[in-house]
Structure formats: C-alpha cells, structure tokens
Amino acid sequence: MCYVIGVKVPKKQTIKVGDAPIELDPIDIPVQSGFSYNPWPVLYNEDKTLRPGLMHWELIPNWIRNQKELVESRKKYTTLNIKSEGIFTNKVAQAVVHTNRCLVLASHFFEWQEVEKQKYPHCIQIENTPLFYIAGV
C-alpha cells in the first residue's frame, strides 16, 4: 500500500486524458505521507468533465458526523487506501465507488522492503513518464 507519494509538474501545461485536454498548474510535492491528511492534487469529474483540484486524502465513512468522530475512527482503522479486490464489498467504499471516483496525480511513490528486520524505502516511478494516475474514490 502506498502511503507515501510525490508529484511534480514543473510548469503550467496541458495534459490529455482520453480526448480531454486538462490545464495543470505547476505542482511540486516531493514527498507526502497520507497520514498528514493534507489535500492532494487529483482529477475529478464535474458535469462529465475532468477538472484538476485538491482533495482530502482519506475516504471518510458516511457515518462520521464531525471532526472528533473522525479523529477517534482513525485510531481504530485507516481509510487512506482501499484495496481494489474488495472495493465493491467494503462497507466504507460501497457508498461512493460508483459516483465519487477520481484520478490521483503522482510522479512517484514509495514502498518499503524489509531486509533482516530493517525496512528500506524504495522510490517507484515510471521511466520516461513524469506524471501518472492512480485510481481514487
């Protein structure tokens, strides 16, 4: 599960997703942990048009009514990432998986490898591809 991610768009540019041109402003977030709960750049659907924007990185269950409940729920479980294998049966994701999808912008992410009880971060990126997308809800 990638909880640590980065994105870099060095200058204003137009990207294409399918046939849709999308204007992106410069972005430079070298490393961010999902556990910081900061906004993250995404492409989201508004009136059948993909638009860039910042969104909260965490799927908040629909039964959470306020900030205090959210903080308490984080102590019990995390909803930063939802595995695709169970997305249609996951109680938290079921309510939004068909209607609230987005593309999470990324240039790289980090996975950890354990060697002799020591964990080491590995930066994973796509060669010759400065920007890619991860499915999000």
PLM regions with names:
Residues 1-137:
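Short linear sequence motif anchored by a di-proline
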